[in-house]
Regions:
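Residues that define the transmembrane beta-barrel architecture of outer-membrane proteins
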Residues: 20, 30-32, 64-70, 83, ...
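Sec-dependent N-terminal signal peptides
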Residues: 4-14
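Repeated loop/turn-to-beta-strand initiation elements of outer-membrane beta-barrel proteins
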Residues: 45-48, 82-83, 129-133
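Membrane-embedded beta-strands of outer-membrane beta-barrel proteins
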Residues: 36, 72, 119-121, 174-178
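Outer-membrane beta-barrel "beta-signal"
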Residues: 76-77, 168-182
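Flexible, solvent-exposed loop segments that connect beta-strands
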Residues: 54-64, 93-114, 144-167
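Membrane-embedded beta-strand positions of outer-membrane beta-barrel proteins
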Residues: 24-26, 50-52, 72, 87-91, ...
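Transmembrane beta-strands of outer-membrane beta-barrel pores
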Residues: 28-30, 52-58, 76, 91-97, ...
Length: 182
């Protein structure tokens, strides 16, 4: 009986996901930063998209390179078929342990978290009924909170009491995704 319930559950979930899309950002994944996403249709023009990207490495050039970014996004498609041009608004967050730009010639690295708020634009092109390609870019404000460490001693180098803080306007999203429409 348990087997039948498990099979029913799997079949029911596949049927329930029939209007949904799974995304793999081919561009970042090939560079060693796997990015997976999920999108579900809300109405004729709106969808909810969420993706996560992370580092497949512990380090690069003997420097720390670990991060995970999760970004939920609301997308608006002017056409009612959820293909073609779209715009999106998103809020995201990340955790990281890496060496920031400008510290390449030192033993210093930064560890912390940030949040991001911004917009994306993109285009979805269906290759077949079930497979599509998506090109997109996005950016906005990035507000970071981190502590600086010396990799040789493990001691903090920055002198900040709690966290260093920085805020920038940056392009931080983009790529070419392969989409599987279920």
């Amino acid at each position: 009986m348990k087997r039948y319930l498990i099979v029913f559950f799997i079949v029911f979930n596949i049927a329930a996901l029939s209007q949904n899309r799974f995304h793999v950002n081919a561009a970042t994944t090939l560079l060693g930063f796997p990015s997976l996403g999920y999108e579900t249709q809300i109405n004729k023009h709106l969808s909810f998209h969420i993706d996560a990207i992370g580092s497949a490495f512990n380090s690069y050039n003997d420097k720390p390179l670990r991060f995970l970014i999760v970004t939920p996004e609301m997308r608006y498609y002017p056409k009612n078929d959820h293909k073609g041009f779209f715009v999106g608004a998103h809020l995201g967050g990340s955790t990281f342990k890496l060496q920031k730009y400008g510290y390449e010639d030192s033993n210093y690295y930064q560890k912390g978290y940030n949040y991001m708020a911004g917009a994306s634009i993109g285009y979805v092109y269906f290759v077949s009924e079930k497979i599509a390609l998506e090109a997109f870019v996005g950016g906005g404000t990035v507000q970071s909170f981190y502590k600086g460490y010396d990799a040789t001693t493990g001691e903090r180098y920055d002198g900040a009491e709690k966290f260093n803080k920085s805020g920038e306007w940056l392009p931080y999203r983009g790529g070419i995704s392969v989409i599987l429409h279920l």
